[in-house]
Amino acid sequence: MDNWLKQEIWSKTQHQDITSDDCLLLSTDWVEFLQMSQFLKQKLLQLLNCIKEKRKKAVIYPPDNKIMFWSYCCAPRDIKVVILGQDPYHGGQGTGLAFSVSYEHSIPPSLKNIFFELQRSDPLFHAPNHGCLNSWATQGVLLLNTVLTVEKGKAYSHSDLGWQWFTNYIISSVSEKLSNCVFMLWGTKAIEKSILIDSSKHLVLKAQHPSPLAAASQRVGTWPKFIGCDHFNQANKYLEEHKKKPISWALL
């Protein structure tokens, strides 16, 4: 299939030869782990070049040096938990990690609910006065948005640019190459990714999105409300059962 795409599609479109993987913005660990073919690398580079062109006409978040920040915070071999987000915060407060914000920004509503659920389920957890989740990532929590860029003030504005194939590839690669990871899928868009995950070798947890809108909804959904889902306790129990060090959620 890859050869056919290369011959029939890619050869007929303008593309740039890749002489160094640095242009992909990914950490070396992730380049080696994903083992993307030359065709897929060119496809990713084309997407990144598209983002550069869009920056000439609009404000795009996050900056180039933060698009793949998740890959520098959490090496593939260290992954224990995967938490999927939708797209970066469109107000510019994102850091390149799903749900996380830099220290100088206020804590967004969805992250406040994440902290609330942690306080409810873990008596040792005390909500911090910031929303930086870097310490989770360095413990092995992959905080991955399924769309990696966004235009200022326009939520999900880059959903049709082509990020989905790349993040789907990441999710399926983690599922295939690793074992006994916990996938936390919150909200419809994240839950749709469950088809990419082998539930026979990983724990897949599903709940409604932690946003206040979902929390306030009176509609009876297929999945449990986020508040009360107990995902953080379930994750650590599973990790301990499989001889892995649990995540210190309180370490922020």
Curated annotation (Swiss-Prot):
InterPro entries: UDG_fam1, Ura-DNA_Glyclase_AS, Uracil-DNA_glycosylase-like, Uracil-DNA_glycosylase-like_sf. It holds the Pfam family UDG. It is found in: Host nucleus. GO terms for biological process: base-excision repair, AP site formation via deaminated base removal. Keywords: DNA damage, DNA repair, Host nucleus, Hydrolase. GO terms for cellular component: host cell nucleus. It catalyses: Hydrolyzes single-stranded DNA or mismatched double-stranded DNA and polynucleotides, releasing free uracil. Its EC number is 3.2.2.27. One of its GO terms (molecular function) is uracil DNA N-glycosylase activity. PANTHER family: URACIL-DNA GLYCOSYLASE (PTHR11264:SF0). NCBIfam families: PRK05254.1-1, PRK05254.1-2, PRK05254.1-5, ung. This is Uracil-DNA glycosylase. The gene is 46.
